[in-house]
UniProtKB/Swiss-Prot annotation:
Expressed in seedlings, leaves and pistils. Detected in the base of flowers and tips of carpels, in leaf and sepal vasculature, in young rosette, in the lateral and tip of primary roots, and in the whole ovule. GO terms for biological process: positive regulation of response to salt stress; regulation of developmental process; regulation of plant-type cell wall organization or biogenesis; response to ethylene. Its main location: nucleus. Belongs to the BBR/BPC family. Residues 158-169 have a biased composition (Low complexity). One of its GO terms (cellular component) is nucleus. It comes from Arabidopsis thaliana. Pfam families: GAGA_bind. InterPro entries: GAGA-bd_tscrpt_act. Keywords: DNA-binding, Nucleus, Transcription, Transcription regulation. Changing N88T: In strain: cv. Landsberg erecta. This is Protein BASIC PENTACYSTEINE1.
Length: 283
């Protein structure tokens, strides 16, 4: 003991071990007709008990204890202690009663799964299809009524009728009335004027609104037909031209002379002297 009268940690009473032999406080279960299972599967049930009914203790048991030393110098020491023998108790109980292990029911493993594996996320294509299906279910589309088409025979008949009507209807000639010397004259009925610069009369081309253009002469050359233009592909050199106002003056001059307008007018001596318009195409 210490100076204060307390027991030390290393104090050992051999008599204390013998006191456990009398009463261990074990409550053994009565034998019941149950399926007895060994404590360790795959081995003998009486593993702890040998063939002679005695308990096989370990070869060497070590107890860690503190040895009473001065307060200034304490160290950790190991002392071998003989373990109490329970051979008498186990031999008595092994003959009459066997230790029964209560079989506990297997708990549901789902309770212990704290972090279950989450299901795979749905693909974007599947979600898009689901959305389309939901939209189609929510708002059903009403089928549009198909337009009735006419049969081919009726269409052909109607097209032929339209074409015949278009062919029958002729465009009405526009009347161009000019007041010449106080007399209204329709120049649209006059014959096409000609030009005799090459020695033979050649009809002129219409130019502008009521004007005319020569097809055989320019200020430099007089030939029929006029040569092709080098600047404009597929067009000829433009001949001399006369506007509607200039042609009206020619008609006034000829009417004073008493010219008969039933004959074609020769424009050889009535062309302008300022040249030609090269951008006019002769066809």
């Amino acid at each position: 003991m210490d100076d204060d009268g307390f027991r030390n940690w290393g104090y050992y009473e051999p008599a204390a071990a013998s006191s456990f032999k009398g009463n261990l406080g074990l409550q053994l279960m009565s034998t019941i007709d149950r399926n007895t299972k060994p404590f360790l599967p795959g081995r003998e049930s009486n593993l702890m008990i040998g063939s002679n009914g005695s308990y096989h203790s370990r070869e060497q048991d070590m107890n860690y204890s503190w040895i009473n030393q001065p307060k200034d110098n304490k160290f950790f020491n190991m002392l071998p202690i003989s373990t109490p023998s329970y051979s008498n108790v186990l031999s008595e109980t092994s003959g009459s009663n066997s230790i029964q292990m209560i079989h506990q029911p297997v708990l549901n493993s789902s309770r212990f799964e704290e972090n279950p594996i989450p299901p795979p996320a749905p693909c974007e294509e599947q979600t898009g299809k689901k959305r389309k299906m939901r939209g189609s279910i929510a708002t059903p589309t009403v089928p549009k009524a198909k337009k009735m088409r006419k049969p081919k025979e009726e269409r052909d008949v109607t097209n032929n009728n339209v074409q015949q009507q278009q062919q029958r209807v002729k465009p009405v000639k526009k009347s161009v009335d000019l007041v010449i010397n106080g007399v209204s004259m329709d120049i649209s009925g006059l014959p096409v004027p000609v030009c005799t610069c090459t020695g033979t009369p050649q009809q002129c081309y219409r130019w502008g609104c009521g004007g005319w253009q020569s097809a055989c002469c320019t200020t430099n050359i007089s030939v029929y037909p006029l040569p092709m233009s080098t600047k404009r592909r597929g067009a000829r050199i433009s001949g001399r031209k006369m506007s509607q106002g200039a042609f009206k003056k020619v008609l006034e001059k000829l009417s004073t002379e008493g010219y008969s307008f039933g004959n074609a007018i020769d424009l050889k001596s009535h062309w302008a002297r300022h040249g030609t318009n090269k951008f006019v195409t002769i066809r």
